[in-house]
Design a protein with these regions (language model features):
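Conserved ABC ATPase "signature" region
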Residues: 34-41, 133, 137, 144-162
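Conserved ABC ATPase signature
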Residues: 166-170
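Conserved catalytic motifs of ABC-family nucleotide-binding domains
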Residues: 187
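Catalytic Walker B motif of ABC-type/P-loop ATPase nucleotide-binding domains
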Residues: 191-195
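ABC transporter nucleotide-binding domain
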Residues: 209-298
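Short, charged/small-residue-rich alpha-helical element at the C-terminal edge
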Residues: 266-340
Length: 340
């Protein structure tokens, strides 16, 4: 059941979200140690200006799932708050389906869904179903259409019995599924997800990921996902935007990133021989461990088989272990490249 239709005049191939050179600054009180400094600041407080986001620009097409990643304090949450209309940019502009999140707020909020993994819009002492009914009234939804949408979401997320229990009695995974359902009752065109699988078990994570993929594929819901779980990114997004120190550092395809950084292979060579003075192009790093040698090679320069054949000719190799790069390793190397 597709519960969302593209608005008249909406072209999926065109930019649906356009962020143009946005900056967000905060005035933060200076804090110096010592009693004298504390007394001075009591009478005359000094401030410094902190740039949380600096000249950020990007465009997102309708129906895309984009991973918006970066270390803590990089500016991810600040960007999401500006996109969702919670914060006003200090400078720059945001247009989402030709709407300004601040100036067109009343119309805009009816077209977005927001899920913060560590915050809840569900009332804890009542069943989630009661909050759903409250949201129906807040968004002034037609009851017949609301019931159809609720049935669709509840079945898809497997929460038929869960929504009848008080929220405080639910597990984290159950609550998160209810949170996601509540954010989609009004059929938003965009879903902002901030750490949607934080603290969830493997089964709950799979349910959430499968659900996001389904509504994106069938209903063309545009999804912006911020998370530290790179498995979420790999499972859902084809494109990532990396932000660091408030600036966009990388915007591109995950496959391209894997080609660039995923060519490094970690190889453990178990041997009693002493391996030294080995001159082979493609060796990035070699270090001696207690009972093996650890090599990192660039498989774009030398293949694993070629590397191993060169070693086996000269040394008596007892065992070999080859570790493939995970998405976490790839992202970590990207962070290291930008010194984050």
């Amino acid at each position: 059941m597709a519960f969302l239709r593209c608005q008249k005049g909406c072209d999926i191939k065109m930019s649906f979200i356009k962020v143009d050179n946005i900056t967000k600054t905060f005035k933060v009180a200076k804090r110096n140690s010592g009693l004298r400094a504390a007394l001075k600041s009591f009478f005359k407080r000094e401030y410094k200006v902190v740039e949380a986001v600096k000249n950020v620009s990007f465009e997102i097409k309708k129906g895309e799932i984009v991973g918006y990643i970066g270390p803590n304090g990089a500016g991810k949450s600040t960007t999401i708050k500006m996109l969702s209309g919670i914060l006003l940019p200090t400078s720059g502009s945001i247009k989402i389906n030709n709407l300004d999140p601040i100036k067109d707020r009343k119309e805009y909020v009816s077209k977005i869904g927001v899920v913060f993994g560590q915050r809840s819009q569900l009332a804890f002492d009542i069943p989630a179903e009661d909050t759903f009914d409250l949201l129906r009234d807040i968004y002034k939804l037609d009851n017949d259409e609301y019931q159809k949408t609720k049935k669709y979401l509840v079945e898809l997320l497997g929460i038929e019995e869960i929504i009848k229990k008080p929220v405080r009695t639910l597990s984290l995974g159950e609550r998160m599924r209810c949170e996601i359902a509540s954010s989609l009752l009004h059929k938003p065109e965009i879903l902002f997800l901030d750490e949607p699988t934080i603290g969830l078990d493997a089964i709950s994570k799979k349910i959430v990921r499968d659900f996001i993929k389904k509504i994106n594929k069938e209903d063309k819901v545009t999804v912006i996902l911020t998370t530290h779980d790179m498995n979420d990114i790999e499972a859902l997004a084809k494109r990532i935007i990396l932000i660091g120190n408030g600036e966009i550092l990388y915007d591109g395809n995950i496959k391209t990133l894997k080609v660039k950084y995923g060519s490094y292979k970690n190889i453990k060579i178990f041997t009693k021989d002493k391996i030294d003075n080995i001159k082979v192009k493609g060796i990035i790093k070699k270090c001696k461990k207690e009972d093996y040698y650890n090599f990192i090679i660039d498989s774009n320069i030398i293949s694993i088989s070629n590397f191993l054949s060169k070693l086996t000719i000269k040394y008596n190799i007892e065992d070999i272990e080859i570790d493939n790069e995970s998405i976490d390793d790839v992202i970590l190397k990207l962070y290291e490249d930008y010194e984050l």
